[in-house]
Regions:
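Hydrophobic alpha-helical transmembrane segments
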Residues: 44-57, 61-62, 75
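Electropositive polyanion-binding surfaces
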Residues: 2-30, 34-39, 49, 67-68, ...
């Protein structure tokens, strides 16, 4: 066994020792006796490299989720609560996201002087304290890795809640009128909307020519100026997208663009409106910076 593994090969009889090495590679054990015998460090990285050389693991295998105790996605049966929905399907709602995204979670629309920001309404499925709620709390957020996405919630919920996957989508809609520096005529409702999904690149091309997006862009610039006048700071840090496709690593610059800045500012506006709503209705909420 020792000779086999030292020579970067193994047989079926060696599998118990290989399993011990795998436990070290995945951070489930701190020590495998055989590693000391063949002069390999008892560390996850050294054990992982050995398993690659033995061709026990494929080079595309990502050990990091297992090392950190992050389980694979689990499917949990879900059904949507029956809630009275405000019909906003007459509005053109735009979900701007990466070209390869299929789980848009925000969209925007214009209704006269009123702006609507729509958020995927997971609350219609995930009740406080439910099995799904506890599952999501344990995961905290989606984990985006180059080779996979480990979801905070079962992927079946994405199919129900993601904006634009169906002809109409349920949403939590935040409506307001921006009058000078004031947010007025605030509404927060459960709604149903009709969504047009559009990539950042395509949105950049029509920001000026699309009547709705041009109006939103004007209000976004006014709100950004209001924040700047009140001492806000904007940090422009380099960002990249790292993806693993067809056995190749792809690294691309995530350059800033007008549509990305528009989406970011709309989320800030949504946060401000929700904070005002919570304040007016004595709702206790965390404050995030």
């Amino acid at each position: 066994c020792v000779d086999n593994i030292a020579n970067k090969t193994f047989s079926e009889q060696d599998l118990p020792f290989i399993k011990d090495i795998e436990k070290v590679a995945l951070n489930r054990s701190k020590h495998a006796k055989i590693l000391a015998h063949i002069g390999v460090e008892n560390t996850p990285e050294a054990a992982y490299k050995l398993l690659l050389k033995l061709k026990y693991l494929d080079q595309t295998f990502n050990p990091y989720p297992a090392r950190h105790g992050i389980p694979n996605d689990v499917d949990i049966e879900t059904e949507m609560d029956e809630v009275e929905l405000v019909d906003l399907t007459h509005l053109n709602s735009y979900a701007i996201d990466n070209a390869d995204s299929n789980d848009a979670d925000d969209a925007f629309s214009v209704d006269g002087d009123k702006i609507w920001i729509h958020i995927a309404d997971v609350s219609m499925i995930v009740a406080p304290g439910s099995e799904l709620d506890l599952y999501a709390q344990e995961r905290a957020s989606n984990l985006y890795l180059p080779d996979q996405i480990l979801h905070m919630l079962p992927t079946s919920i994405t199919k129900l809640c993601a904006l634009g996957l169906s002809e109409t989508s349920p949403a939590l809609s935040i409506g307001f009128v921006l009058s000078g520096k004031e947010m007025q005529d605030i509404e927060i409702v459960h709604s149903t909307i009709k969504v047009t999904n559009i990539s950042y690149d395509d949105a950049d091309k029509i920001l000026d020519s699309n009547e709705d997006l041009a109006k939103i862009q004007t209000l976004v610039e006014l709100h950004r100026q209001y924040r700047s006048n009140n001492g806000s700071m904007s940090l422009s840090l380099p960002r990249v997208d790292v993806r693993f496709k067809e056995g190749q690593v792809e690294i691309s610059d995530q350059a800033s663009s007008p549509s990305r800045e528009l989406v970011a500012e709309m989320m800030i506006m949504a946060g401000r409106v929700i904070a005002l709503f919570a304040q007016d209705n004595d709702i206790v909420m965390p404050y995030a910076i």
